């Protein structure tokens, strides 16, 4: 099933007929494959690892699939399609990336939902693109087109992240935050409670949903002998975490994982401020799956140590998978669950 944005793109397939096409920031569907009905070849860069995995079975010579914050090649295309990002700060980066991978006078196509800020696109396009033209408006989505009028600037990573100091119970750390990765530029309340109650860990530890690497940097600062895996589903978060490790002179294994599917499965500890906060049924199911996977990936005697909004129903699934529920600390908003695998 294609998303509304993808459906609107496909009904404008004459825009990229017989073109070489690059798709940036595509959604969780098979749009890149569907484009081949009109395009001569398609390359697609996913910033969400789950979206990349959905497409992976369809990889072919004329359908090149990538995951990360940039393409591994310098290839240029007739058209670049950008899905307007939910994190608006990410949009200028995607436009720069599109510009660098367009042929001279190449075509930019931007699609997005009305409620996602796409209407403001004409004001957001950098001046190396011509004025945006509204090509279609349907299914609560808009398609804009534009043309590259001069060479886009080189992408220098240092232009696309902010660096700031963070005071933690483990000492001061430097955080590097790529555009599109949420940051309050201070220690959020949940992570603060987690780090104030940081236990002594040992061996191989997993930081699940590592984000920009706040927990990882604090943990390794206090306990440098740990072997730490940092996983996230978001390419910009993984790049942020890598930069944070470098800035603090720390070392960790940083890689993409859809849940825990790509992890080693043999950990002495799992630590996390899980990215499940809204309390919806779907979120509850994801949280339940997370606890189940954490138990399966822990060695006997391993420590499960997370912080969660106190209204989220973690207790039942922790009891089911760990035999008991141990709340080691709490305040009026958060609880620290700290359980040993028996």
Curated annotation (Swiss-Prot):
Report the GO molecular function annotations: 16S rRNA (guanine(1207)-N(2))-methyltransferase activity; nucleic acid binding
Q: Where in the cell is the protein located?
A: Cytoplasm
Q: Which domain of life is it from?
A: Bacteria
Q: What class of enzyme is it?
A: transferase
Q: A single GO CC term, please?
A: cytoplasm
Q: What Enzyme Commission number(s) appear in the record? A: 2.1.1.172
Q: Which InterPro entries match?
A: DNA_methylase_N6_adenine_CS (IPR002052), Mtase_sm_N (IPR013675), rRNA_ssu_MeTfrase_C (IPR023543), RsmC/RlmG (IPR046977), SAM-dependent_MTases_sf (IPR029063), Small_mtfrase_dom (IPR007848)
Q: Please provide the record's keywords in A-Z order.
A: Cytoplasm, Methyltransferase, rRNA processing, S-adenosyl-L-methionine, Transferase
Residues in the signal sequence: none
Reactions this protein catalyses: guanosine(1207) in 16S rRNA + S-adenosyl-L-methionine = N(2)-methylguanosine(1207) in 16S rRNA + S-adenosyl-L-homocysteine + H(+)
Q: How does it assemble?
A: Monomer.
Name the protein family. Answer: Belongs to the methyltransferase superfamily. RsmC family.
Q: What role does this protein play?
A: Specifically methylates the guanine in position 1207 of 16S rRNA in the 30S particle.
Descriptive protein name: Ribosomal RNA small subunit methyltransferase C
Q: What is the lineage of its organism?
A: Bacteria, Pseudomonadati, Pseudomonadota, Gammaproteobacteria, Alteromonadales
The gene name on file is rsmC
């Amino acid at each position: 099933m294609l998303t509304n944005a993808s459906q609107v793109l496909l009904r404008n397939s004459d825009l990229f007929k017989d073109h070489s096409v690059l798709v940036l920031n595509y959604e969780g569907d098979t749009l890149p494959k569907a484009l081949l009905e009109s395009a001569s070849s398609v390359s697609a860069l996913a910033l969400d690892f789950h979206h990349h995995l959905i497409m992976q079975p369809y990889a072919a010579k004329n359908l090149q699939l990538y995951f990360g914050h940039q393409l591994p090649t310098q290839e240029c295309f007739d058209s670049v399609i950008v899905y307007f990002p939910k994190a608006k700060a990410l949009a200028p980066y995607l436009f720069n990336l599109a510009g660098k991978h367009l042929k001279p006078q190449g075509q930019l196509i931007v699609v997005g939902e009305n409620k996602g800020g796409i209407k403001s696109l004409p004001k957001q396009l950098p001046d190396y693109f011509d004025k945006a033209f509204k090509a279609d408006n349907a299914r609560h989505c808009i398609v804009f087109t534009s043309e590259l009028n001069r060479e886009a600037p080189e992408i220098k990573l240092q232009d696309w992240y902010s660096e700031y100091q963070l005071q933690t119970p483990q000492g001061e750390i430097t955080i590097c935050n790529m555009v599109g990765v949420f940051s309050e530029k201070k220690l959020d309340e949940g992570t603060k409670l987690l780090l104030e109650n940081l236990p002594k860990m040992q061996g191989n530890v997993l930081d699940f949903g590592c984000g920009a690497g706040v927990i990882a940097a604090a943990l390794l600062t206090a306990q440098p002998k740990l072997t730490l895996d940092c996983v996230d589903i978001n390419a910009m978060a993984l790049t942020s975490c890598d930069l944070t490790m470098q800035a603090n002179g720390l070392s960790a294994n940083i890689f993409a994982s859809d849940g825990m599917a790509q992890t080693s499965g043999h950990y002495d500890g799992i630590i996390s401020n899980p990215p499940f906060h809204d309390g919806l049924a779907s979120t509850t199911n994801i949280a339940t799956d997370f606890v189940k996977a954490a138990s399966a990936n822990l060695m006997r005697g391993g420590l499960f140590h997370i912080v969660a909004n106190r209204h989220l129903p973690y207790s039942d699934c922790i009891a089911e998978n760990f035999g008991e529920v141990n709340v080691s600390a709490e305040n009026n908003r958060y609880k620290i669950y700290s359980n040993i695998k028996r």
